[in-house]
Amino acid sequence: MYRLTSKLVIYRNIGKDSILFKLADIFQRFSTGQYVKEDLITEIYDQIHNLLDLSTRYGFDKNLWHNYLAFLLAMSENPFTLVSEKVGANEGTVNEFAKGDFAIFKQLFDYDFSAIEKELGIDCFSVVLNYKAIVKSEQIFNKSVSEKVQQLSTDIEKAEDESEMYKIVTDFYRTYGVGKFGLNKAFRVNHNENTRQAGEILEPITTTGNMSLDDLIGYESQKQKLIENTEAFVKGKKANNVLLFGDAGTGKSTSIKAILNKYYSQGLRMIEVYKHEFKDLSTIISEIKNRNYRFIIYMDDLSFEEFEIEYKCLKAVIAGGLETKPDNSLIYATSHRRHLI
């Protein structure tokens, strides 16, 4: 396995701390014979534990090894995958490196674990290759991510070679995107700097609800204006920031969440930002401005007191500072205070 992972080029950014690279290191030591059996088994079980933990988090089932490899491909943001997200399969020398990596992943998909299991007297790899997950509520894991990754895994299983796998994966990138923005609908600010990736401030919201505009009775003209504005936005046409105002319980927040569900498949994403997080708006915009999605920055129950100054950060984004708000983002806010207009 180490001989395979060491040759990765495009997907080398998967990282040495990943399950894949940890297992590759274990298999390298196994191949040399320079190991303590009990210690090696312990290290293998550590990675199996990590695999089970990830699989539970994302609701994976059946072949967890294949699902994990598909997950790596779906989440790996690099120059090749980000370009594929925008244009799909494309001409260029980089494709030779990509196909080389896909040939490696194809071998990893077909990897034979029987030798190490026989030598160490374990069967954990056989178990995860034929896994039956406990039925879980969809509230426990992100169903959207789970279904996409498992379908990608199934499609790769059927690929004959790296060229076919190249088409499958690049089509996936073009259809769904790559990384957290490709696989998730909604996001929030992550205040824990220890869990942030470099240059990233947003984390996925894994449960967003399945509300629909049809669930709201009345307000037909308002809903139609919201639909028309959002539809223009996702199509790259001129659209406006939106303020929904009215009494509590009139469906303002539900309308915006329903809009996300309606246009998610067309590339719409939503970022929930609270008033105390307005200072982070410029950082948020820096993270999303070059991505091939349309982002609604969602502010719920917006209001300001006379002594509060957070509105200045919002005003700078709307009015435009040195770095203007990019064309792929709009602000949708709700409030019970009409004077905010």
Model regions and ranges:
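Walker A/P-loop
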Residues: N241-E272, T283-K289
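Walker B catalytic acidic pair
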Residues: D300-L302
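Interdomain "pre-motor" coupling segment immediately N-terminal to P-loop NTPase/helicase cores
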Residues: A133-L202
